[in-house]
């Protein structure tokens, strides 16, 4: 623990507290009020005021520390979670992308043109093969180079001009020695230059013998830039680091250059970088479909001066109970603050009651000042408590929005690969022959590497299925879908056709996407390749990866017409127009209420990936939605009595609230106000149904009377009891809140007949300016019929 400006913070929070301006603002306001309380306590003691302020002052002091520490911890948690979301999304998106690369290298290494070229070892063949590599790279734009080498390391051909000698890089030997598997390295190689490159290699075989090594060089810098630009919203620094903490690539080479070792200590929350303190977090990549990734992590940093800035979403009204998302500690803080304020209200109220029979102007003024200071203290605590809850709510909103963004980004990236796959496989010479047996073997090999497909089909120029990778029962079937005709009309090898998301007979009647590309021979379509996406498990996996930890959360993909493509559970809310009208790349987050329950909702409309859905003519908008349940919808408004001006020569009236109804009794009829927490509740019917229990007072069992039903406020909170006397019987009147004790002008009660049971309890009306208050009769309250 460490102390900062008189407040003791946990060690991991204390160094950062000075940068949390709202914490400092609340601390200064409460410190100023603390000095005022000290002065008022001294004056109360010197004036023999019957108001012991010590307990209330001590409680305020204790809660001040707890409130500020809690606020600081939650602000740090929010900032850390925001950075954590950015870091986790970055590394997980990269891992999913690289998973596709492991499939690419495995399939391309079996490409007939590549295998035949390696076996021929003919420069003329290699020159022609280079054009095929360019066609591949035009579809799979994630690669910056493709290199084909002989078993002895000689570069046979490559996508871009560069090293053309004999490679001695270890990756060649590793690929040759790893039969049937890929080699993944991030290191400098002689065929890629002095800088490290993320490279995937696979041995090229013919008849079981190695005839070459194929290497795909991933364009990591461009991919990282796209990921970081999408995630960094302010001045965050994002970097991928290797297992030793060395920077691989970052979005700010000046602050985190490649090769720089980020020295993170376990549990460290901050890091000095370039003379500036940064909040820092690190997240490691999670395996995807068995692929562990390259073993990297994302480090995310934000200057502390910006990390704790006001978030626009922090202004959301917390009108939900939050028992499943707020800790009990958070829920207790505003409750304790209100309880302390009520004890202060009782103290001041009782002080005014005790002064009613006296003419001590100083004591009355002192009590009024104590009450005013209490109200100012209450305002500060309410603002701080509200900020505490909205800070946590902002974290939920940010989490929902981030995860919705992740889900739809992963979807677009995944389907980008599907558009690439169909276009590339349509260039296969084997499939162009329309030989069913040869095609079936090729399609089965493809589907074994690319497991995201339920089936891969070859169809002819009439739309008849020639071969299938898995479900061969569709062979010979005539396909009449619109996407088939669209595909066969295409004459550009870079174009493709796609179905809308709809039920398909090729997918057991369930909804899915089908991507298709034409097989062109001499400029004419002789058929096409169709990929039936295995949407049910694939979409579910994407959504579950974006599912918050909060129990009952739901993630979904929707269309703009509200139709649900996939979901992890029933959507508990109706999506509003603000969600369904989102345009590409737009996000929304907010709180929705349905059926008396509240939900934090985040949504993002997909914006495509690279050329997919951005410049390739494909338009299929999808919105990612994440819903987090937040408990019952509640109204946090607490009714308070208005300020009442004293009327010269008036009668002192003690006012109070039952529910939201402002009522009063003559101050002279009130002995005092007491707590009712320890009351014994009983129920009686008939005439005595107002008599609801007892509370111990002055060593006696004080009957309690409840008139809430009489004022149409049944069920209102009952936090105080006014000790009154009816004849010779003491009793306690249950009330919700205390109002002012003020001098008011009394008038006779008139014209109130027929307005409910409350009229039977009213003796007079009290007036101050435009405020009229019914003044109740103690005798009628205790002994009158209940209706």
Across the structure, where does each feature detected by a protein language model lie?
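Extracytoplasmic/periplasmic ligand-binding sensor regions of membrane-associated signaling proteins
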Residues: 127-226, 267-281, 432, 447-455, ...
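Short hydrophobic alpha-helical segments used for membrane anchoring or interfacial signaling
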Residues: 110, 146-153, 237-244, 272, ...
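Conserved secondary-structure micro-motifs at functional edges
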Residues: 645-776, 781-782
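Short hydrophobic beta-strand segments that form the core of ligand-binding sensory/regulatory domains
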Residues: 199, 211-217, 295-301, 514, ...
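Flexible loop/coil segments at beta-strand boundaries within sensory signal-transduction domains
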Residues: 205-209, 288-292, 506, 520-524, ...
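Extracellular/periplasmic juxtamembrane segments that couple receptor/chemosensory ectodomains to their
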Residues: 2-74, 260-395, 575-644
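Solvent-exposed, extracytoplasmic
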Residues: 126-140, 213-267, 304-330, 437-450, ...
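Extracytoplasmic/periplasmic sensory segments of membrane signal-transduction proteins
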Residues: 26, 31-179, 350, 354-492
